[in-house]
Design a protein with these regions (language model features):
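N-terminal Rossmann-fold cofactor-binding loop
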Residues: 8, 29-30, 168-172, 230
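Short, Asp-centered acidic motifs that coordinate Mg2+ and/or phosphate
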Residues: 44-45, 67, 197, 225, ...
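Short, conserved active-site loop motifs that form the nucleotide-linked donor/cofactor pocket
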Residues: 23, 88, 183, 272-274
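Rossmann-like dinucleotide-binding domain for NAD(H)/NADP(H)
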Residues: 90-91, 165, 223-304
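Phosphate-binding beta-alpha-beta segment of Rossmann-like dinucleotide-binding domains, i.e.
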Residues: 86-88, 93-142, 154-157, 161, ...
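Short glycine-/small-residue-rich Rossmann-like dinucleotide-binding loops
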Residues: 51, 73, 196, 201-204, ...
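An N-terminal-biased, well-structured beta-alpha scaffold segment characteristic
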Residues: 1-91, 191-193, 213-219
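Rossmann-like dinucleotide/phosphate-binding beta-alpha-beta segment
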Residues: 131-222
Length: 304
Protein backbone atom coordinates (compact mmCIF):
# COMPACT_ATOMS: atom_id res chain seq x y z
CA UNK A 1 0.00 0.00 0.00
CA UNK A 2 1.44 3.41 -0.98
CA UNK A 3 2.01 5.88 1.82
CA UNK A 4 1.73 9.68 1.71
CA UNK A 5 2.86 12.42 4.11
CA UNK A 6 0.84 15.64 4.38
CA UNK A 7 3.26 18.07 6.04
CA UNK A 8 1.27 21.32 5.91
CA UNK A 9 -2.17 22.29 7.17
CA UNK A 10 -4.87 21.92 4.52
CA UNK A 11 -8.45 20.78 4.07
CA UNK A 12 -9.11 17.25 5.33
CA UNK A 13 -10.57 16.55 1.89
CA UNK A 14 -7.07 15.46 0.83
CA UNK A 15 -6.78 12.92 3.63
CA UNK A 16 -10.24 11.52 2.86
CA UNK A 17 -9.39 11.09 -0.83
CA UNK A 18 -6.20 9.18 -0.02
CA UNK A 19 -8.03 6.94 2.44
CA UNK A 20 -10.81 6.30 -0.07
CA UNK A 21 -8.16 5.18 -2.57
CA UNK A 22 -6.56 2.83 -0.02
CA UNK A 23 -3.46 4.97 0.28
CA UNK A 24 -2.01 5.23 3.78
CA UNK A 25 -1.71 8.84 4.88
CA UNK A 26 -0.09 10.63 7.81
CA UNK A 27 -0.80 14.27 8.62
CA UNK A 28 2.20 15.73 10.43
CA UNK A 29 2.41 19.50 10.27
CA UNK A 30 4.90 21.99 11.67
CA UNK A 31 7.87 19.64 11.40
CA UNK A 32 11.42 20.96 11.15
CA UNK A 33 13.71 19.94 8.31
CA UNK A 34 15.51 17.46 10.57
CA UNK A 35 12.23 15.94 11.73
CA UNK A 36 11.09 15.44 8.14
CA UNK A 37 14.44 13.91 7.19
CA UNK A 38 14.01 11.26 9.90
CA UNK A 39 10.61 10.07 8.65
CA UNK A 40 10.61 10.80 4.91
CA UNK A 41 12.10 7.39 3.88
CA UNK A 42 8.74 5.84 4.85
CA UNK A 43 6.77 7.69 2.19
CA UNK A 44 6.02 7.29 -1.51
CA UNK A 45 4.36 10.69 -1.77
CA UNK A 46 4.44 14.05 -0.03
CA UNK A 47 1.93 16.92 -0.01
CA UNK A 48 2.86 20.48 0.96
CA UNK A 49 1.45 23.98 0.78
CA UNK A 50 3.88 26.86 1.33
CA UNK A 51 5.17 26.33 4.88
CA UNK A 52 7.25 23.21 4.24
CA UNK A 53 10.47 23.79 2.32
CA UNK A 54 11.32 20.62 0.42
CA UNK A 55 15.09 21.01 0.43
CA UNK A 56 17.91 18.99 -1.11
CA UNK A 57 18.63 17.46 2.30
CA UNK A 58 15.05 16.20 2.55
CA UNK A 59 15.10 14.85 -1.00
CA UNK A 60 18.46 13.13 -0.41
CA UNK A 61 16.89 11.30 2.53
CA UNK A 62 13.69 10.43 0.65
CA UNK A 63 14.78 7.02 -0.59
CA UNK A 64 11.26 5.90 -1.54
CA UNK A 65 9.69 9.20 -2.55
CA UNK A 66 8.16 9.18 -6.02
CA UNK A 67 5.94 12.25 -6.11
CA UNK A 68 5.65 15.64 -4.40
CA UNK A 69 2.40 17.57 -4.65
CA UNK A 70 2.04 21.29 -3.96
CA UNK A 71 -1.49 22.33 -2.98
CA UNK A 72 -1.14 25.65 -4.76
CA UNK A 73 0.29 27.15 -7.92
CA UNK A 74 3.95 27.97 -7.25
CA UNK A 75 6.57 25.32 -6.51
CA UNK A 76 9.40 27.60 -5.38
CA UNK A 77 9.41 25.98 -1.93
CA UNK A 78 10.44 22.70 -3.59
CA UNK A 79 13.95 22.05 -4.94
CA UNK A 80 12.61 21.02 -8.34
CA UNK A 81 15.99 20.46 -10.08
CA UNK A 82 17.07 18.00 -7.39
CA UNK A 83 13.69 16.26 -7.52
CA UNK A 84 14.06 15.84 -11.29
CA UNK A 85 17.56 14.42 -10.87
CA UNK A 86 16.06 11.79 -8.60
CA UNK A 87 13.18 11.09 -11.03
CA UNK A 88 10.62 12.42 -8.58
CA UNK A 89 7.49 13.95 -10.09
CA UNK A 90 6.54 17.44 -8.86
CA UNK A 91 2.86 18.35 -9.20
CA UNK A 92 0.92 21.51 -8.44
CA UNK A 93 -2.64 22.82 -8.72
CA UNK A 94 -2.62 25.76 -11.14
CA UNK A 95 -5.89 27.63 -11.13
CA UNK A 96 -7.12 26.06 -7.91
CA UNK A 97 -6.68 29.25 -5.91
CA UNK A 98 -6.68 31.77 -8.77
CA UNK A 99 -10.00 33.33 -7.88
CA UNK A 100 -9.09 33.64 -4.20
CA UNK A 101 -5.77 35.29 -5.04
CA UNK A 102 -7.29 37.68 -7.57
CA UNK A 103 -10.03 38.69 -5.13
CA UNK A 104 -7.42 39.39 -2.45
CA UNK A 105 -5.37 41.46 -4.88
CA UNK A 106 -8.50 43.46 -5.63
CA UNK A 107 -9.17 43.83 -1.89
CA UNK A 108 -5.62 45.12 -1.43
CA UNK A 109 -6.15 47.63 -4.23
CA UNK A 110 -9.32 48.94 -2.61
CA UNK A 111 -7.76 48.95 0.86
CA UNK A 112 -4.73 51.03 -0.08
CA UNK A 113 -6.63 53.40 -2.38
CA UNK A 114 -9.36 54.09 0.18
CA UNK A 115 -7.05 53.88 3.24
CA UNK A 116 -9.43 51.39 4.82
CA UNK A 117 -6.97 49.88 7.36
CA UNK A 118 -6.12 53.33 8.77
CA UNK A 119 -9.80 54.29 8.87
CA UNK A 120 -10.65 51.06 10.69
CA UNK A 121 -7.80 51.34 13.21
CA UNK A 122 -8.46 54.96 14.14
CA UNK A 123 -12.23 54.53 14.35
CA UNK A 124 -11.77 51.61 16.75
CA UNK A 125 -9.70 53.96 18.91
CA UNK A 126 -12.48 56.54 18.95
CA UNK A 127 -10.56 58.89 16.67
CA UNK A 128 -12.88 60.48 14.11
CA UNK A 129 -10.42 60.99 11.24
CA UNK A 130 -12.98 61.75 8.54
CA UNK A 131 -11.35 65.04 7.52
CA UNK A 132 -7.93 63.40 7.24
CA UNK A 133 -8.95 60.47 5.05
CA UNK A 134 -9.37 61.12 1.35
CA UNK A 135 -9.38 58.10 -0.93
CA UNK A 136 -8.81 57.53 -4.63
CA UNK A 137 -11.38 56.09 -7.05
CA UNK A 138 -10.74 53.27 -9.52
CA UNK A 139 -12.91 54.76 -12.25
CA UNK A 140 -10.96 56.07 -15.27
CA UNK A 141 -7.66 54.81 -13.83
CA UNK A 142 -5.12 52.55 -15.55
CA UNK A 143 -4.39 49.15 -14.03
CA UNK A 144 -1.15 47.47 -15.02
CA UNK A 145 -1.03 43.70 -14.58
CA UNK A 146 2.39 42.01 -14.65
CA UNK A 147 1.83 38.38 -15.62
CA UNK A 148 -1.34 37.15 -17.27
CA UNK A 149 -1.85 33.62 -16.03
CA UNK A 150 -4.91 32.41 -14.14
CA UNK A 151 -4.71 35.11 -11.46
CA UNK A 152 -3.92 37.99 -13.78
CA UNK A 153 -6.75 37.04 -16.12
CA UNK A 154 -9.20 36.76 -13.24
CA UNK A 155 -8.20 40.16 -11.84
CA UNK A 156 -8.69 41.76 -15.25
CA UNK A 157 -12.21 40.36 -15.34
CA UNK A 158 -12.98 41.51 -11.80
CA UNK A 159 -12.27 45.16 -12.64
CA UNK A 160 -14.25 45.25 -15.89
CA UNK A 161 -17.10 47.15 -14.28
CA UNK A 162 -14.89 49.99 -13.02
CA UNK A 163 -14.31 51.67 -16.39
CA UNK A 164 -10.56 51.16 -16.16
CA UNK A 165 -7.91 50.87 -18.84
CA UNK A 166 -6.03 47.60 -18.38
CA UNK A 167 -2.42 47.20 -19.50
CA UNK A 168 -0.79 43.77 -19.39
CA UNK A 169 2.85 42.74 -19.52
CA UNK A 170 2.96 39.12 -20.66
CA UNK A 171 5.01 37.31 -23.30
CA UNK A 172 2.14 34.95 -24.06
CA UNK A 173 -0.63 37.53 -24.43
CA UNK A 174 -0.16 38.25 -28.14
CA UNK A 175 -1.04 34.68 -29.08
CA UNK A 176 -4.17 34.87 -26.88
CA UNK A 177 -5.16 38.49 -27.54
CA UNK A 178 -8.42 37.64 -29.30
CA UNK A 179 -9.69 36.05 -26.08
CA UNK A 180 -9.05 39.19 -24.02
CA UNK A 181 -10.19 42.24 -25.99
CA UNK A 182 -10.53 44.27 -22.78
CA UNK A 183 -6.76 44.42 -22.19
CA UNK A 184 -3.80 45.92 -24.03
CA UNK A 185 -0.33 44.39 -24.17
CA UNK A 186 2.51 46.64 -23.05
CA UNK A 187 6.22 46.46 -22.41
CA UNK A 188 7.33 46.63 -18.78
CA UNK A 189 8.66 50.20 -18.73
CA UNK A 190 5.62 51.65 -20.51
CA UNK A 191 3.28 49.79 -18.17
CA UNK A 192 4.86 51.01 -14.95
CA UNK A 193 5.11 54.60 -16.21
CA UNK A 194 1.51 54.80 -17.46
CA UNK A 195 -0.31 52.80 -14.76
CA UNK A 196 -2.02 54.21 -11.69
CA UNK A 197 -1.91 50.75 -10.10
CA UNK A 198 0.71 48.08 -10.86
CA UNK A 199 -0.25 44.59 -9.69
CA UNK A 200 2.18 41.67 -9.85
CA UNK A 201 0.93 38.18 -10.77
CA UNK A 202 4.03 36.58 -12.23
CA UNK A 203 6.80 34.19 -11.26
CA UNK A 204 9.98 35.45 -9.70
CA UNK A 205 12.96 35.89 -12.00
CA UNK A 206 15.03 32.76 -12.52
CA UNK A 207 18.15 34.52 -11.22
CA UNK A 208 16.31 35.66 -8.09
CA UNK A 209 16.77 39.35 -8.85
CA UNK A 210 13.84 41.68 -8.13
CA UNK A 211 11.76 42.91 -11.05
CA UNK A 212 11.01 46.26 -9.43
CA UNK A 213 13.84 48.39 -8.01
CA UNK A 214 14.63 52.03 -7.26
CA UNK A 215 15.27 52.83 -10.92
CA UNK A 216 11.81 51.56 -11.82
CA UNK A 217 10.10 53.54 -9.05
CA UNK A 218 11.63 56.70 -10.49
CA UNK A 219 9.72 56.04 -13.74
CA UNK A 220 6.35 55.64 -12.01
CA UNK A 221 3.71 58.25 -11.29
CA UNK A 222 4.02 59.76 -7.78
CA UNK A 223 0.29 59.06 -7.43
CA UNK A 224 0.63 55.37 -8.32
CA UNK A 225 0.30 52.25 -6.17
CA UNK A 226 2.09 48.88 -6.20
CA UNK A 227 0.36 45.60 -5.34
CA UNK A 228 2.22 42.33 -4.76
CA UNK A 229 0.29 39.12 -4.12
CA UNK A 230 2.70 36.98 -6.14
CA UNK A 231 6.20 36.34 -4.73
CA UNK A 232 8.14 38.24 -2.09
CA UNK A 233 11.39 38.64 -4.00
CA UNK A 234 9.71 40.23 -7.04
CA UNK A 235 10.04 43.69 -5.48
CA UNK A 236 13.13 44.99 -3.69
CA UNK A 237 11.64 45.71 -0.26
CA UNK A 238 14.24 48.30 0.75
CA UNK A 239 13.76 50.16 -2.52
CA UNK A 240 9.99 49.98 -2.07
CA UNK A 241 10.26 51.39 1.44
CA UNK A 242 12.50 54.20 0.19
CA UNK A 243 10.14 54.93 -2.71
CA UNK A 244 7.22 55.27 -0.28
CA UNK A 245 9.18 57.51 2.08
CA UNK A 246 10.51 59.69 -0.73
CA UNK A 247 7.12 60.09 -2.41
CA UNK A 248 8.12 58.32 -5.63
CA UNK A 249 4.83 56.39 -5.36
CA UNK A 250 1.72 56.96 -3.24
CA UNK A 251 1.32 53.58 -1.58
CA UNK A 252 1.75 49.82 -1.69
CA UNK A 253 -0.13 46.71 -0.62
CA UNK A 254 1.90 43.55 -0.04
CA UNK A 255 0.86 39.98 0.79
CA UNK A 256 4.22 38.25 0.25
CA UNK A 257 7.67 38.88 1.68
CA UNK A 258 11.28 38.02 0.89
CA UNK A 259 11.51 36.03 4.11
CA UNK A 260 8.51 34.24 5.57
CA UNK A 261 7.18 34.07 8.20
CA UNK A 262 7.92 37.80 8.21
CA UNK A 263 8.74 38.44 11.86
CA UNK A 264 10.68 41.57 10.99
CA UNK A 265 10.60 43.52 7.74
CA UNK A 266 11.65 46.97 6.59
CA UNK A 267 8.08 47.69 5.47
CA UNK A 268 6.68 47.19 8.97
CA UNK A 269 5.28 50.43 10.40
CA UNK A 270 5.38 52.25 7.07
CA UNK A 271 2.02 54.06 7.08
CA UNK A 272 1.85 54.00 3.28
CA UNK A 273 2.00 50.20 3.13
CA UNK A 274 -0.92 47.81 3.65
CA UNK A 275 0.48 44.41 4.68
CA UNK A 276 -1.12 40.97 4.98
CA UNK A 277 0.56 37.66 5.96
CA UNK A 278 0.50 35.68 2.67
CA UNK A 279 -3.24 35.02 2.83
CA UNK A 280 -4.26 35.71 -0.78
CA UNK A 281 -5.04 32.05 -1.42
CA UNK A 282 -6.45 31.43 2.06
CA UNK A 283 -10.17 30.99 1.58
CA UNK A 284 -12.38 28.11 2.61
CA UNK A 285 -13.30 27.48 -1.00
CA UNK A 286 -9.76 27.54 -2.41
CA UNK A 287 -8.37 25.32 0.35
CA UNK A 288 -10.89 22.62 -0.54
CA UNK A 289 -10.27 22.89 -4.29
CA UNK A 290 -6.46 22.67 -4.10
CA UNK A 291 -6.54 19.84 -1.54
CA UNK A 292 -8.92 17.88 -3.75
CA UNK A 293 -6.86 18.53 -6.88
CA UNK A 294 -3.51 17.52 -5.40
CA UNK A 295 -4.87 14.41 -3.66
CA UNK A 296 -6.53 13.18 -6.85
CA UNK A 297 -3.39 13.81 -8.91
CA UNK A 298 -1.13 11.97 -6.48
CA UNK A 299 -3.61 9.11 -6.11
CA UNK A 300 -3.77 8.67 -9.88
CA UNK A 301 0.02 8.67 -10.10
CA UNK A 302 0.61 6.17 -7.29
CA UNK A 303 -2.15 3.77 -8.31
CA UNK A 304 -1.66 3.75 -12.08
Amino acid sequence: MPKVLISDSMSNVAQKIFEKNNIAVDVKTGLSEDEIIKIIPEYDGMVVRSATKVTKKILDAASNLKVIGRAGAGVDNIDVPVAKEKNMIVMNTPGGNANATAEHAFALIMSVLRRTPFANETTHKGQWEKKNIKGTELSKKTLGIIGFGNVGVRLSNLVKGFDMKILVNSKSLESRKKDYPHVENSNFDDLISKSDIVSFHCKAAADGKPLLTKEHFKKMKPTSYVINAARGNIIDEKDLNDALNEGLIAGAAVDVFSKEPAKDNILFNNPKAVLTPHIAASTTEASIVVAEMVANQISDFLLN
